[in-house]
Structures are given as C-alpha cells and as structure tokens.
Amino acid sequence: MKNIYQGKSVLFCLTAIAASVGVSVATADNARPMLEEIIITSEKREASVQDTSIAITAIGSEQLKDLNIFSQQDIANFTPNMSYQESAGGGEGNRIYMRGIGRETSSTGTDPGVGVYNNGFYTTESGVLSGSFDRIARVEVLRGPQGTMYGRNTTGGAINVVAKKPGDEMENVVRLRKGNYDLTNADITSSGPINERVGYLVHYSKTEQDSFFTNVSGADPKGTDSDYIEAQLDVDFTDSINWNMRYFSASFDNETLERNKLDGYRNEVGAPSKLGALVINPELFSPLATAPTDPFEISSDMVGFVAVDDQHTYQSTLTIDTGAMQIKILNGYQDYSWYGEKDFDGTASPVSYVEKIGQAETNKQHEIQFISNTDGDISWVAGLFYYNVELNQPYTLTDANNPYLINNGTVPNPDGIFYTQRGILDSTSKAAYGQVDWQASDKLTMSLGLRYSEDEKEGSETQLQVYDAVVDYCTEAALPYVQGYGAYFDPALVSPAFAGCRFGMV
C-alpha cells in the first residue's frame, strides 16, 4: 500500500493580548533567589518574561537546579495547562499535551500538536526536555497557537529548550548525585574562551538506576542506563556576525513494562483470547492463579526494554546583525535509531508473545529568520522553514516457544512471528510565516500574523500474516471455522488440538 498526502494551509490571526497574561515561574520578586526575573527569546528576540504578551512559563537553569527539575514530568508539574503522558517503565509512547492538544498516536506519519524546539531546531522527541542544568540555559513553554512565530506543529503551543552557550570565563564543573534504587548520576562540564573571539563548551552525563519493580516470575527489569555527550564551538567573526556550531549524541537502554497485567488471569479452559482467536490465550498456561497485587511487582517471562543508539545531531546557527534587523540562518541534521521489546501478553506463561518495534530516522531542516532590531512600538518577525524526515519502522509480534509457528510448513519462521509490518515514510514540510506586534500601551499588545504551510507525505506499509500452509488443518469437529478469511480456533479446544493436530496457520 502506498499513500501520498499533500496539504496546504494558510493561517491568519489578529489578537489583542494583555501583557499581564504571561505566566512564569520567573518573576521580578528578588526576595527569593528562585523567583528572579529571567530573559527569554520565545518571540525570537530577547525580552523580560514580564514584558512578554503571551501565556508563557519560563524556567531558568537556576530554577531547574533549585526545584530539582530533571524530567519532562517535572516541567509539566510546574506548567499550567500542560500534561505529560509517559509510558510505563519509560517506553516509546511519551507525549506532551497543551490545553488538551497533543499527540494522540505515535503511528508513522502522524505529528504532535505541540512543537518542541531544541535550541531553535524542531524535534518530535520530548526527551530533549530532560537533562542537566549545566547544559540547559532555560525551558520556555508557550501555551496556545504559535504558528505565526514558528515553523511547524504549534497548534497547542511550543516548547523551547535553550542550550547554554560557551561562557566568557573558564569554568569546570563536576556533579555527582546518588539516590534511591541505586541511582547514580554524574555530570561533567567544561566551558570557556579559547581566545577573545572563540569559545567552547563540552558536557558529558551518565545516569544509572535500578528498577522500581520486582519480577516474581523471573529476572527483574533492568532499570535505566543513559549517556549524553555534547560539544559546542561559538565564534564571533566580527561584532555583528556570530556562528554557533553544536553537536550532541545520546543513548539509553531502559526498561519498559507497558503490558504488565494488573487484574487476575483468565486461566480457565474457556477463557477468551487476549488477541481475539488469532493465537492461543497465554493466560491459560500462566503459573499464577492471580496477577500480583503489589503495584511494584510484576509477573513476566521476559525483561522488556527500549534503547536508542547511534543518535547524532548537528546544529549550525549563523547570526548576522545588520543594525535594522537580525538575520538567523539555521541548518540542522539528525540521524538515530531506536529499538524495543516488551512482553505483549503480560504473563509468565510459556506461551510468550513478544512485541518488537524499531525505528531508523534521518531528518534535516533549514530555516532563515528575519527579526526587527528597532526600539519602537512596532516590531516584526518573518521566516522561511524547510523540514524533511525519512523513517523506517518495522513491527513484529512473535512467540518463539510455539512449535506450530516455527514449523508451520509454509515459510521458514525461526522467530515464531505471527504478525509483521513495516512502515516507510518520506515527509517534507515547507512554511513561510510572519508576525507584526504593536505595543499600544504598557498593558496592551496587538499582533497581526500570517502563515502559509505546505506538507507532502509519501509512505508505504507492508503487512504479512500467514494463513495457509502445506499441512492440513484439523477437522471442523476439532477446529471450527469462524466466518471471514483465514482459519481460527476456539481456545476452549486448545488441549485436544495440541494432543492430536498440527496447525499450519497463524
């Protein structure tokens, strides 16, 4: 199956916004250090958070440290109208919502409703929100549509994760952190000038932690293990031309517990199959009469995981100040792959269904921004945006313990695959946007914005399901048919079927 999708849209907006609607963790109150005012760039130019006319939460590096904010969930806890949905055990289904708008599915070809920007570069991965305050200058969360200020997917809002730049003075920092469940975290940062026009920053972090859960039927989950490395070079060619080059790479190997059963097993002979009647109900053979009642205990025959490897990101930002306006030229490239396995049946049964999913992705983006540099009541921003992503996502369901899947008489199937699919996508987005702001008074700012966007998606999906085999099915008396294509069996007849029949279907 091959689908090509093209879409064009134009967005026009006129708003009158009171400056007081900007909400932030940062305020002008100097009585408490964690509430000091911070400078943001959410509207493409530097401004005090109190002078910004949009609904925003801004958390600087000092607040990140003082409030012990380390994860996406921590940021959501401090941000009004923002929620974060995390898969159990740190799986691959993590999603951000703003005012009820977010990503409803992670299926290939879908896009989130909240745009995440890593140092000005668009990304679909929420993981960039978590990290050390030694490398993150601030996190800016903008609530509400931002399409006339950003290049892509900001219907619900936009999140800017702004990286720290090389400092003017030499600084070397080593931080060690220990915690429950044998948590060990190390952050090493070095930053400073090489000469009067060139600065550098390098950062490395390592985090390990045991699982919160105990497996009563096998090996315990593996917990978390992650690495991150970053290098920056910042060059001032002249007083008005700056070039920032940034590289970072991340990897992790974490547990995932997405299919853990919380209710009792259906292990009577006539129990319905969890997957319809496609394959045997694994709960029938579960060694436990009931699932664990302790929320920190699981019963599984395998240790699930999700891992990212070979992730490399390159970012280049050239800034030219002409006096009347500032021009920014952004070029980025990223490639990475991730892979995960999890217990699909949620039991410790010898009938073991395993879900295997992976993704290899390459994306590149280019953007040019024009930002007014005047001090009057009128300011403006305009930009051109280009983004291309190519991804390949395989997905399989297997039962390597089932001899009738492995020896089905049709095709070699050593992994016991009973379902497989592969999605391939090539997506290109182009956009032109602009916004003019008129500060009518200290309390009122009026904005006029225009946006044009064009999306083209070309994708294909292949699915393979084996229904027929060389060997015969059992007789209808032992294996009744169900209306529709293919043959299915009744789980109530599993025992006699295994005793006297060979199955050539899945």
Residue ranges, per PLM feature:
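N-terminal Sec signal peptide and the immediately downstream disordered periplasmic leader
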Residues: 1-67, 73-77, 191, 239-240, ...
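Outer-membrane beta-barrel translocator/receptor signature
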Residues: 111-113, 125, 134-143, 148-215, ...
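Signature of Gram-negative outer-membrane beta-barrel scaffolds
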Residues: 216-217, 381, 386-506
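Outer-membrane beta-barrel channels and translocator barrels
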Residues: 69, 195-197, 236-240, 322-325, ...
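Acidic, small-polar-rich N-terminal luminal/periplasmic segments of exported/outer-membrane proteins
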Residues: 32-169
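Residue-level signature of outer-membrane beta-barrel architecture
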Residues: 118-120, 143, 192, 233-235, ...
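Periplasmic-side early beta-strands and strand-to-turn transitions of outer-membrane beta-barrels
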Residues: 160, 168-169, 177, 188-286, ...
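Transmembrane beta-strands of outer-membrane beta-barrel proteins
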Residues: 172-174, 200-202, 243-245, 327-329, ...
